[in-house]
Amino acid sequence: MNFHYCNIGSAIIKEIYFQTKNTFNMKKIAEFILIVSILFSMSSMAQYNNLWIPDTLSGTSFNLTIKDTFSQLRTGQQTITSGVNNKFWGPTLFVNKGDTVHMNVRNSMNDSTTIHWHGMHLPAVMDGGPHQVIPPGTLWQPYWQINNLAGTYWYHPHLHEMTLEHVTKGIGGFMIVRDPQESALALPRKYGIDDIPIALTSRRYDATNQFVVTNTVYGDYMLTNGTPNAQVSLPKQYVRLRILNAEIERGYNLGFSDNRTFYIIGNDGGLLNTPVSATRVKLMVGERVEILVNLGTSNVGDSLNLMAYNSNQAFGFPGGEAGVAGQFGSLLNNIDFTVLHIKVTATTANPITSVPAVLANNSYWTSADATVSRNLTITGGQAGANQPFVFDNTAFNISNINKTINLNDIEKWTVTNNNIFGHTFHIHDVQFKIVARNGIATSVGDFESGWKDVMYVPRGENVSFVAKFDDYSDAIHPYMYHCHFSNHEDDGMMGQFVVNNTAVSPTIATLACSNAFYSAAPTANTLFNGTATIGYTGGNGIAYTTGSAISSTGVTGLTATLQAGTLNNGAGNLIYTITGTTATSGNAIFSISFGGQTCNIVLSVSATPPNNTDPIISSLNCTGVQ
């Protein structure tokens, strides 16, 4: 039987044995029989499958099609899956720092969805969060300049209340940024040979081989790059593994089966300043880690396993729950298991044989740099599935902006988890620096010392980070922050923030008051509520706030107030809300001044209609009336 399944079997059988040896527990005995039958079934499919290496796309223009399809993941019936240009998962996108990239994302599914560029620093309207919905049969075309450092990023769906289902079905992919600093280092970068992307996830299947999608289910079977029982052949030299936790909820405590040392060279936001040696690294949902492992000490033909050493983790570790039954049970819970089998092959030409002593020269923000401090508390969840986890007792509402941040502010956020369960916290737009765990700077692990966009907040702890919100502002389109467990974010463990530009004023070239459009015409002595739409040209793309009330002249009694918005880069419209009551008819005149331009709009007020609507006569002849 495969080593992976032997580990599962021995752990589960041992657990059930100790729970039943002193008591006649029919439920546990039945569970034991079920597990043994499952393990025998597993043994029939224990052969390894070659790890699928995602195909690549590079350049500045990318065509991506999201589609529903089928995948042969198990013996028997095919599994309904979704992918990007593939049956499961998507291509690896190679981009260069400084380039402007154009994405052509077509949704060929029957459901609406989104694609979020996880870890990317980009305008909010291009971010691909819950607001950038791609309906079925439509094309979304975001574009932005790559400002990120070289590193391993990814893309995945982010439609509110559908993220769990779409992630489970397989939508996602890697995005690798190159830059001159990383390219100058002697690092493995022959993609698919000594530079391997590894997406870790697991799934549970029903009786017809379909994925089980519920918000409390851990997977029972590993899928590494969508490959069950995956193995890969790697050369006898230093190799680079770019590992992503693409799970729904499970964490991984990663290491090698022979306990060999490896070197962490990067995490979410790019390279660390110096390598960190380790034999274990915890990787939570959404996090990435780049490691170098020396296979030069092995012989050709040797094999080893990349393992998840998930047994005996601290209470609250996602996937550390004991047992295979119950709401949170899983065959992979609280055990050590294989995530990738590795076979050592011959050395390639021009191998990498050492680890660079210095990788980068990152300068990080500190607590002292922060001018604004914010606190978030993870709440809810204590009463089970009917009380979902949220932030600050507030469930996500797509119409509510939870935080407003000023452009170029450096902020310190502290996320506190007084809850029963550990969570991962992800924020869009920025890379941050973790500065303290439980208020202690020295408690931050070396492996998480670089730029991050995801951090793990264990139960009963708090974690602080510092970030600068620069380059992009938009008073209308928000970014997200959320737990990166797909089930939790779908249930409302998410908030949103906007970045306001208070330093740059909105400007326009022309203002077309003479062609203003009015939603309605006011009548004297009648309360009026309407709008005026005024066209402009030459907008500079800057956000603006609600304006002060402008009182009418000529006919008085009305006020016009500019509605908040963001200027287009070019032509667009300003909208003013007009309210009030006039005493007379005539022309109400408003003096508009905006963005360096002034003009008048004129609104015609009609006369008051008669209050008495009874018929009017000039005389009445009552002669002869008795």
Short names for language-model regions:
Residues 117-119, 125-130, 134, 263-275, ...:
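Active-site pocket scaffolds in enzymes
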Residues 47-292, 312-314, 324-380, 462-466, ...:
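Histidine-centered copper-binding motifs that mark active-site loops
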Residues 1-35, 42-45, 501-626:
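Extracellular low-complexity Ser/Thr/Asn/Gly-rich intrinsically disordered segments
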Residues 145-151, 294-300, 468-475, 579-585:
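Short, surface-exposed loop/turn segments at beta-strand-coil junctions that are enriched for proline
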Residues 117-121, 248-262, 426-432, 545-555, ...:
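Short acidic, flexible loop segments centered on an aromatic residue
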Residues 153-158, 297-312, 474-485:
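Short, surface-exposed ligand- or partner-binding patches at beta-edge/loop junctions that are enriched
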Residues 150-152, 238, 301-303, 462, ...:
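Extracellular Ig-like/FN3 beta-sandwich strand-entry sites
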Residues 106-110, 244-249, 381, 416-420, ...:
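Short solvent-exposed strand-capping/beta-turn motif centered on an Asx-Ser/Thr pair
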